[in-house]
Amino acid sequence: MSNEVSLHGEKISVAGKIPAPGSQLPEFKLVNKDLEDMTLGDFNHKRKLIYIVPSIDTPVCADSSKKFNEMLNQCSHSEIACLVIPADLPFANARFAEKSEDGLPNICFLSMMRSRQFAKDYGVLIESGPLAGITSRAVVVADEKNQVVHSELVKDIGLEPDYQKAIEALTASAQ
């Protein structure tokens, strides 16, 4: 089963389905900047904003990650895990965070370098076209019990997500 997104008007096939509101987040094993495995369980008891992007080295991905970081400054983020997951190596993620003005303290960058299973399970693995093998752009928000409260598969990879809906879902899940 696959979805379609587009890039500059060209249709691109994406494997699977993004987790829908009301469903449980799929488990994952990803890699942090220190090359340590991280699982969904490492973020238990926190609300989660999972932002999946093609590459942190693109302007839209970089700018939108910074925007989420800024928006989280307005939230009580001690109980929030903001995970940004590009299809990049941990070294690129660390370099991007280090070069940012404030170091992006609200974001935990994770990499799929050891497996693309995360991208399949979260319905974002691009199957066709020149970007095959990396991820589409998506946002998934879940509560402390890993129940999805909001998800968006951005229909055009070159566009930004709906920040306001994601943040509203994140803050509403605290109540």
PLM regions with names:
Residues 1-175:
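Chalcogenol-based redox active-site neighborhoods
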